[in-house]
Amino acid sequence: MDIAKTLQKIAEELGGSFTEYSDNNLILTVPTKDGRFQGITTYILEHDGKKVLEIASRVCDADLPGINYRSLLEMNQELTYSKILIFDGYIQLASEVLAEHVNEVILKDIVDEVGHTADKIEFQLTGKDVH
């Protein structure tokens, strides 16, 4: 499967946009609720000799006052493909999958979950469309 072409098709199907920033950094922007948009970055990496897709979306700064971190951890139980985590100083939604085990349907489900859930949490925590 051509990951870039598949992600471009998914972005178009979701009414969003696609940018191939580099060979291993692909960016989708997808529409969410109430006219907001969410940026999703896919990194194509190699772990232990296997191609891995890391699909992530920033939510907000991890040190934003008033964050209930326990509540965020508990939300992980409700997610199918992604998890809430802190990386590079940001709360993010992220998913990793072996490229050889993913197909277009699953990839679209992952993008949908990451984008919409990140937007939902971002709006709950900040009241804004930040990322």
Annotate each PLM feature.
Residues 6-13, 71-75, 124:
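Residues that form generic nucleotide/phosphate-binding pockets
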Residues 28-54:
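Glycine-rich portal/gate segments that line the openings of hydrophobic small-molecule binding cavities
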Residues 34-35, 61, 99-101:
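Short, surface-exposed beta-strand-loop junctions and turns on beta-sheet-rich folds
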Residues 50-90, 94:
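Short, internal acidic amphipathic alpha-helical interface segments
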